[in-house]
Every structure is written in C-alpha cells, then in structure tokens.
A protein has these predicted regions:
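Non-catalytic C-terminal accessory region of glycerolipid acyltransferases
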Residues: 47-178
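A generic secondary-structure signal marking the coil-to-beta-strand transition
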Residues: 5, 17, 35, 143-145, ...
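Short His-Asn-centered micro-motif
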Residues: 3, 21-24, 66-68
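A generic structural signal for short
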Residues: 9, 41, 76-77
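A broad structural signal for alpha-helix termini and local helix breaks/kinks
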Residues: 13-14, 95
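Membrane-interfacial amphipathic helices and adjacent loop/beta segments
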Residues: 14-51
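Short, small-residue-biased leader/transition segments that mark boundaries at the very start
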Residues: 2-9
C-alpha cells in the first residue's frame, strides 16, 4: 500500500528516526502525527516554543525543519523562502548536530500565495495562510516532487567568523544551489 511504501522509505533513512518540526495544525492529518514534532508558535502555548525546539534537538531523531518558519512565499512572481531564522544554527552548535541541506521542490496553490500576499498588504499579522496548510498538502497528493540532499555540514563549521544569521544565509545559499 501507499502508506507502507512511505514508511519503508522513511525507515531506510536513519532507521526511521526522522521527524519533521511542523506547525501543530498539521497534526490534524493523523497519518503525519508519528512523523512530526508539533510546534505551536501562536496563542497561549507560544511560550513553550523554545522548549519544544529544545526537546526536538535533544532527541535522537534526525530533524527536518523549515528554517524560515513559514512556507515559501511568492514575491514578484518568484516563489522563495523568507529570511531564514538562526535557530537551526544556534541549536545545531549547542546540540553538536550536523546540518544536512535539503531542497524540496514543490509549490502550493495560487490561492495560498495570493492569500499570504493579501494578508501582508492588509497588515494582518496572523498567518491566515497556515490554516490552509493541511488542505495544500492534500491538493498535492499523488504528485511527484524532487528532493535533493546535499553534503552534511559539520556543526563545527558554524564558528564565530559569521553571526548565526550569517551562517543561516550561508546554508540557505547552499540549499538554493542544490
């Protein structure tokens, strides 16, 4: 079955110990729950965000995260990530964990990108587009995506020669060249 193939693919990498740090709204897709570490960045539980990230890095799971903290956005007709946050650099050094650059080539619907842009124009701070993430995932069922995995970057690379934000940009540049 499709689910068995997905689990087989996941289990072939790092013995199945791969987790995605995702917005907790995606936990409503029950098939994703075992693969994810839910992150709540809004509301009353937002104060737990640092603890949730810390727990993910302290685990023995390999973590896949989205360093921009949001899905890519379409700006001037180009779909790109927003600025990457430095969290993954700081935590990689603290936890002595290497960073493996991964480029996932995919896209959301025009509705999603237009909604995100409309909210930005209207000055709406709440990320309304995230409410549609589960729907966007379902729209992409049965589609093929290209995932390119780069060479691991040792955590020791992230020294004081650049700021954590500078290193985040460095890794972003590597990912976009994959």
């Amino acid at each position: 079955s499709r689910r068995q193939r997905q689990m087989c693919i996941r289990d072939s990498f790092y013995g199945g110990k791969v987790k995605y740090m995702v917005n907790d709204l995606l936990m409503n897709l029950h098939g994703l729950a075992p693969l994810c570490i839910p992150i709540n960045k809004t509301g009353k539980q937002a104060k737990d965000f640092p603890r949730m990230v810390e727990a993910g890095f302290a685990s023995d799971n390999q973590l896949i995260m989205f360093p921009a903290g949001l899905c890519s956005r379409r700006q001037n007709g180009v779909i790109r990530d927003l600025d990457w946050k430095k969290t993954f650099i700081v935590k990689s050094v603290e936890a002595h964990r290497d960073v493996v650059p991964i480029h996932f080539e995919g896209r959301n619907s025009n509705f999603f990108y237009n909604l995100a842009n409309l909210c930005k124009i209207l000055g709406i701070k709440f990320n309304i587009a995230m409410l549609y993430l589960a729907d966007e995932m379902l729209k992409n069922r049965h589609k093929t995506f290209t995932i390119t995995i780069g060479k691991p970057i040792p955590w020791q690379t992230f020294d004081k020669s650049k700021s954590p934000a500078g290193w985040a940009q460095y890794v972003k540049d590597i990912v976009y060249k994959l």
